Amino acid sequence: MPLPCDTILQAALIVTQDDARTVIEDGAIAIHEGRIAAVGQRDAIVGNWHGATVIDMGASLIMPGLVNAHTHASMTLLRGLADDLPLMDWLTGHIFPVEKGLTGELVELGALLGCAEMLRTGTTAFSDMYLIEDATLRAVDRAGLRCLAGEAIFAFPSPAYADPETAFDLVRAQHDRWKHHARAALAVAPHAVYTSTPAILARCRDLAEELGLPIHLHLAETATETAQCIEQHGARPVPYCDGLGLLTPRTTLAHCVDLTEGEIDLLAERGVTVAHCPESNMKLASGIAPATAMLGRGMTLGLGTDGAASNNSLNMFTEMTSCALLHKVHHMDPTCAPASAVLDMATRGGAHALHMQGIGRIEAGCPADIIALDLRAPNMQPIFNPASHLVYAATGHETRLAMVGGEVLYLDGCYTRFDMDDLLKEVRKARTWAMEQVRAAR
């Protein structure tokens, strides 16, 4: 007699991203109470399981939802606000002045727009660092994605706190509010070495230890940052942070562009995870992170889009393409960054960066965070190697379905938890606000 389950999901092809990287033709997944109960051939699953709901995606490819290892979701509201500038000019001359006027309502609106973009292009979980993160998590709660959120901690006031001394109490309060949420988690997120002091970074380390939270930090993004760190602290960013005890297996570092070979060895020894953001690094001309060297040392890398103000997209499929192509031409070696390794970064590596066990793969016992791509799209045929298609051919807009915890959040152009037309009306109003902030800052 078939076992009961909530949902049976069927499709022409399943890319599991399990340890064996199994690919199943004419497959199905049994889902019960938000988790994958079984995955296998369609006939076997249908014969052994009875689903209260059956979703037949037909000529689609099912795979784990992508994981964005580093972004600032609310910065969708600043997309295209300032382009073609070096990082520090972009930040201090354009982004920081506008962000001074942010409110919780605006952060929530921008985060919801970011969630919509991510679902539409196959991302079901993300690591966020921004301002007024309670508002980001309200958007996450509304949209249904998973999120590791970190309130950016600075050595100066932010829209979330007038006094940096109160930032730590704010993070504690956020942790208390969200620690039992099924899809949200908190990180301690000192923004960067150049926006912090040694005392603030040490307190971030202590707070993370106290609450059992991971650390999320921008580090070694540019050579300018390195020079400034040497001038102010007498050390390069990586050894400086190591001396403060910030580099642990619970730490994810965004960017890590300007590294020495010895620093790569140190990061590998400490078990740190790196969120590689190739498109943002290219657009800001920050440099090229030594991703292949880090992978060669056995490090875990996730893939991140960074914010839509510096990318200008939250599309993880295009990020995968850029990652693979960038490292091939940088090293003049077509074997660098193979499709399988880049796909791992966008799934399993991202899951590791978010410290969320089981996502980024499709196998029994894992959360049912799943997407389906339309194989009827001309660019998706013929299929010889699914990983190749996902990294080099897919655009993200083939996404037909996005599911988190067994719940359908997006299906064939429709969002199940919010109205996109209503959201866009509010976004257009926010554009007027952003333009006013720009004028006031000049």
From Swiss-Prot:
Report keywords, A-Z: Hydrolase, Metal-binding, Zinc
Look up the EC number in the record and give it. Answer: 3.5.4.28, 3.5.4.31
* Record's catalysed reaction(s): S-adenosyl-L-homocysteine + H2O + H(+) = S-inosyl-L-homocysteine + NH4(+); S-methyl-5'-thioadenosine + H2O + H(+) = S-methyl-5'-thioinosine + NH4(+)
Q: State the Gene3D superfamilies in the record.
A: Metal-dependent hydrolases, Urease, subunit C, domain 1
Q: Name one Pfam family in it.
A: Amidohydro_1
> What are the recorded GO MF terms, alphabetically?
5'-methylthioadenosine deaminase activity; metal ion binding; S-adenosylhomocysteine deaminase activity
Transmembrane residue ranges: none
Cofactor descriptive note: Binds 1 zinc ion per subunit.
Which amino acid positions bind Zn(2+), per UniProt?
Answer: 70, 72, 218, 306
Q: Does the keyword Cell membrane apply?
A: no
The cofactor named in the record is: Zn(2+)
State the coiled-coil residue ranges: none
Provide the top EC class. hydrolase
Where is substrate annotated to bind?
99, 191, 221, 306
What does the sequence similarity comment in the record state about its family?
Belongs to the metallo-dependent hydrolases superfamily. MTA/SAH deaminase family.
The free-text function statement in the UniProt record for this protein reads: Catalyzes the deamination of 5-methylthioadenosine and S-adenosyl-L-homocysteine into 5-methylthioinosine and S-inosyl-L-homocysteine, respectively. Is also able to deaminate adenosine.
> Could you identify this protein by its name?
5-methylthioadenosine/S-adenosylhomocysteine deaminase
The scientific name of the source species is Nitratidesulfovibrio vulgaris (strain DP4) (Desulfovibrio vulgaris)
